[in-house]
Amino acid sequence: MSTTNELVNRIDETYEISNIVKEIEIDKIALSDLELLATGGYSPLTGFLGKRDYDSVVETLRLANGSVWSIPITLPVTEEVAEKLQAGEEVKLVNAGNVYGVIQIEDIFVPDKEKEALLVYKTTDEAHPGVKKLYERPNVYVGGAIILTKRFGNNPFPSYHLDPIETREEFKKRGWKTVVGFQTRNPVHRAHEYIQKSALEIVDGLFLNPLVGETKSDDIPADVRMESYEVLLQNYYPKDRVFLGVFPAAMRYAGPREAIFHALVRKNFGCTHFIVGRDHAGVGDYYGTYEAQEIFTNFTVEELGITPLFFEHSFYCTKCEAMASTKTCPHGKEDRVILSGTKVREMLRNGEIPPSTFSRKEVVEVLIKGLKKEVVTE
């Protein structure tokens, strides 16, 4: 495994698979992980974690060689499938009848899922979407290096779906020496816009990198969100300072640990800085408001390879008549309009139109149209 910021490349569409007999049916999460492992999005990982690295990541947020890595990237299989596999063999990775890759099996092991839940998600509560998914997936893990033998054909956002090598190239083309990454699974409301633009004041470019893999069922669908990002960037951001590209991973909802993971992945995509806001990658009340920022104190910027930028909760202040945070505004709670993606979602679902202090009107229009479409298809 490479520890420098070299990109791993495990794509080989000419790899000979015709004589490989065994196969593993992989789920959507493993499929998106397979792609990100192969394209270098998860560098320095070269495959699904073996037991030694898995234990190390779960317990110490580092790989066995000491490199920082906070989320276990695993390939779960059923006991029935595991019985037919052995270390040292190559097995095809299949989803919906298509062979997408190969795993070179290094080891097969049974994880302690309760321990994984407790240490990675800080809870064993099955109401937590990450924990629920962890328990739903099969109980045996297969570790080993992978090879991606087929690129995905039915990509919903082809013009925004770029590999790390391509985003790095784009940033270079634009002459950006410093790039700040922003992770989101929500439409961008005014608080996000304020944070992004504050960060943009100190770097050359903003990489808006929405997650479009598997999310909770009540999250706003990716196609609606993408349209909302397009109208926002078109109307309110300087075109030569912002770049939109999707992050095809599944959402883990692992709060602090996922914040580290999101930063490491954005480094691979070419970012030098990464925005960490309040309750980054959180869900419900499982994590403290700024826990995802505090976790970064356990690591140096050198070992992360990317500089985190921390932002406090921002709001619209009716007295300042502007977006602000507690760092910049002296007024009391009664003057603050607190904005959140959850609140915007709630208002839209109840047929209310969020005020312009919450969200840009162009964004609201896209969301209302998208939700109407959703209701019709349900």
Curated annotation (Swiss-Prot):
Protein's gene: sat
Pathway: Sulfur metabolism; hydrogen sulfide biosynthesis; sulfite from sulfate: step 1/3
Organism encoding this protein: Bacillus mycoides (strain KBAB4)
Entry keyword set: ATP-binding, Nucleotide-binding, Nucleotidyltransferase, Transferase
Enzyme Commission number(s): 2.7.7.4
Keyword Cytoplasm: no
Similarity remark: Belongs to the sulfate adenylyltransferase family.
Catalytic activity from the UniProt record: sulfate + ATP + H(+) = adenosine 5'-phosphosulfate + diphosphate
Top-rank taxon, per record: Bacteria
GO BP field: hydrogen sulfide biosynthetic process; sulfate assimilation
Main enzyme class: transferase
Protein name listed in UniProt: Sulfate adenylyltransferase
Gene Ontology terms for molecular function: ATP binding; sulfate adenylyltransferase (ATP) activity
